[in-house]
C-alpha cells in the first residue's frame, strides 16, 4: 500500500504536470516570437480599382505570406497628381510603413522626398527605375502589338487610334509611342480619333459601302478598348467595317470580348505577379534586404491563347 507521504507526492506530481501544461498552453514558457505586421498602402492612379483585379489578387497573396496588411487607395479624380502626392503624405503621417504607388506622373512622384520606403510601378524602361521598383515597359508593349497588327492585317488597311489626350496616363503615352514608331517605320497610315470624336467615326463606318474598305482600330488603354468593343459588338455594320480591334488589358470584360472574337488581339502582362512582387519589394525594403528592379514581360494573345494553360493561369489566377 502507498503510504500517506506517497499519496501526497503523487498529488503534487499531478499538480505540477497540470501547471506545466497550463503554462505551455498559455505561452508562459514557450512563447511564439511576435512578427511585426507591416502596414502597406497602395495608391493607384485611377478612381476605381476594376482594372486592378489580378494585381490585387497577387498583392493579397504576398500580404498573407509576408505578414503585411495592404490597403488599396483610389483617387477621387483620375490622374490627379496633386491628390496622389497628398495621399502619400497623409499615409506617411498616419503611420503607414511603406507605400506602393502607380504614379500619375512618374517624374514628380519619384522625386518626392519620403521618410518611408516607396515602391513605384514604373511604366518606363528598367534603366530609368530605382531598386525595388516594378517595371512594365509600355513602350515595348506598344511596339509588340503594332508588329502583330502589321503581321495580321493587309498593308492597305488604315489604322485608327482611339485616344484621350486630356486623360492620358504615362502608360498610355508610352504605349502609343511604341506603336506609332513601328507603324511609322513600316509606312503604315495611322490616324487619331480623339475622345469625343468616336461617335462620328462609328457613324461613318455604318454608312453603306464602307465595309468594302476595312479599318483597324487600336485603343490606347483598357477603358477605351472596352468601350470600342461594346460598339463593335452592338452594331453589325460597324463590325463588318472593322477588320481588327486591338489594345491592352486583362479585365473580365476585355477577355470576354476576346473570347467572342469581338477583340482581335491584346497585349498583356502578368498583373498577378506585378501585385505580388510589389508587396514583396516593399517588405524587403522594410527589412533592409537588397533588391533590384523587377522587369515584367509582355505577351501578345488572341482568342486561341485563352485556352493555353500558361496564359490561362496568368489571366485567371486562383485566389
Stretches with model-predicted labels:
Residues 8-25:
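Hydrophobic membrane-insertion alpha-helices, especially the h-region
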Residues 92-103, 119-121, 158-163, 190-191, ...:
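Periplasmic-binding protein-like
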Residues 26-55, 132, 158-167:
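Short beta-strand segments enriched in small/hydrophobic residues
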Residues 9, 273-319:
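Hinge/cleft segment of the Venus flytrap/periplasmic-binding protein
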Residues 133-158, 250-254, 269-287:
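Hydrophobic alpha-helical segments within soluble ligand-binding/sensing domains
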Residues 105-140, 251-259:
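Flexible loop/hinge segments that line or gate small-molecule binding clefts
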Amino acid at each position: 500500500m502507498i503510504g500517506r507521504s506517497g499519496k501526497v507526492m503523487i498529488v503534487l506530481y499531478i499538480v505540477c504536470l497540470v501547471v506545466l501544461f497550463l503554462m505551455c498552453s498559455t505561452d508562459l514558457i514557450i512563447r511564439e516570437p511576435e512578427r511585426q505586421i507591416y502596414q502597406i498602402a497602395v495608391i493607384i492612379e485611377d478612381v476605381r480599382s476594376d482594372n486592378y483585379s489580378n494585381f490585387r489578387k497577387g498583392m493579397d497573396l504576398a500580404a498573407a505570406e509576408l505578414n503585411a496588411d495592404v490597403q488599396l487607395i483610389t483617387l477621387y479624380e483620375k490622374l490627379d497628381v496633386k491628390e496622389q502626392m497628398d495621399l502619400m503624405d497623409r499615409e506617411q503621417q498616419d503611420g503607414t510603413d511603406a507605400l506602393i504607388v502607380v504614379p500619375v506622373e512618374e517624374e514628380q512622384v519619384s522625386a518626392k522626398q519620403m521618410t518611408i520606403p516607396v515602391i513605384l510601378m514604373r511604366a518606363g524602361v528598367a534603366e530609368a527605375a530605382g531598386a525595388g521598383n516594378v517595371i512594365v515597359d509600355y513602350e515595348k508593349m506598344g511596339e509588340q502589338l503594332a508588329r502583330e497588327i502589321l503581321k495580321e492585317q493587309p498593308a492597305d488597311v488604315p489604322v485608327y487610334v482611339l485616344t484621350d489626350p486630356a486623360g492620358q496616363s504615362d502608360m498610355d503615352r508610352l504605349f502609343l509611342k511604341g506603336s506609332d514608331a513601328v507603324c511609322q517605320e513600316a509606312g503604315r497610315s495611322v490616324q487619331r480619333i480623339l475622345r469625343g470624336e468616336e461617335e462620328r467615326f462609328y457613324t461613318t463606318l455604318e454608312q453603306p459601302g464602307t465595309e468594302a474598305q476595312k479599318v483597324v482600330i487600336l485603343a490606347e488603354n483598357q477603358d477605351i478598348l472596352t468601350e470600342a468593343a461594346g460598339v463593335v459588338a452592338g452594331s453589325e455594320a460597324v463590325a463588318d467595317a472593322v477588320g481588327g480591334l486591338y489594345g491592352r488589358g486583362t479585365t473580365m470584360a476585355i477577355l470576354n470580348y476576346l473570347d467572342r472574337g469581338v477583340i482581335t488581339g491584346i497585349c498583356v502582362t502578368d498583373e498577378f505577379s506585378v501585385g505580388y512582387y510589389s508587396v514583396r519589394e516593399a517588405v524587403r525594403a522594410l527589412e533592409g534586404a537588397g533588391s533590384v528592379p523587377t522587369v515584367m514581360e509582355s505577351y501578345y494573345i488572341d482568342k486561341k491563347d485563352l485556352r493555353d494553360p500558361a496564359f490561362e493561369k496568368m489571366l485567371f489566377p486562383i485566389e
